[in-house]
UniProtKB/Swiss-Prot annotation:
Transmembrane segments: none annotated. Residues 12-100 form the Acylphosphatase-like domain. Its EC number is 3.6.1.7. Signal peptide: none annotated. GO terms for molecular function: acylphosphatase activity. The active site is at 27, 45. InterPro entries: Acylphosphatase (IPR020456), Acylphosphatase-like_dom (IPR001792), Acylphosphatase-like_dom_sf (IPR036046). The lineage of its organism: Bacteria, Pseudomonadati, Pseudomonadota, Betaproteobacteria, Burkholderiales. This is Acylphosphatase 1.
Length: 102
């Protein structure tokens, strides 16, 4: 994402994934997928057994990332996903990382 038009097109979404998504390497796989797609932000487990992710990137990048989150990895069983668009202005992320459980 190097051009001014790319920066202007940035989208940020907060995603909550429910189902069997903890204790199976879902967050680690999420970090790998996000980095491969060029998505920045973070992912963390929640105490309610869900996984929460803040995603930032171009619309097509976030569509691909949300599709992956909804399907998950082979060991996951995604039962539901909530996506919230974060209105601008929003903080800029420079990488994708795994955060501690909240």
């Amino acid at each position: 994402m190097g051009t001014a038009s790319d920066a202007a097109a940035l989208v940020t979404r907060l995603v909550r994934v429910r189902g069997r998504v903890q204790g199976i390497g879902y967050r680690e796989a999420c970090v790998r997928r996000a980095r491969a797609l060029g998505v920045t932000g973070w992912v963390r487990n929640r105490m309610d057994a869900s996984v929460e992710a803040m995603l930032q990137g171009l619309p097509l990048q976030l569509e691909a990332m949300c599709a992956w989150l909804d399907e998950g990895m082979p060991a996951a069983l995604v039962e539901g996903m909530e996506v919230i668009e974060v209105p601008a202005p929003f903080p800029r992320f420079d990488r994708f990382e795994q955060l501690p459980t909240l």
